[in-house]
Amino acid sequence: MYCNNSNSFEKNDIPKTKEAQIAVLTPSEDKDFIVRKIVLKNGGFMPNHTNKIQHQQYVLKGTAKVVVGEEEFKAKEGDFIYIPAGVNHYYEACFDSDYEFLCMITTKDDEITML
């Protein structure tokens, strides 16, 4: 059994971003999935990039501009975002609030390509 508050995990700055932190919530013994909590402070961003693996995301708090492929969204609390493998995407917390979301991925090898 495993139950911990998501605010109690170690947060690390995400390289090549502005005002973005990540915390891995999944216990290390899980060999199938990884759940991460990502926080973009107001004015923060993650630049345009692709990943070899898909992402499934659930917005916990705030509002942000999210671009997936050619589509731009104003993502907000309660939204679910699916990002297929290999599709470019970026995030910008530009609506006067921090933006927090869960990002679920598999444990397959990933490769990030900055665009």
What are these regions (language model features)?
Residues 70-86:
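Short acidic-glycine-tyrosine-enriched beta hairpin
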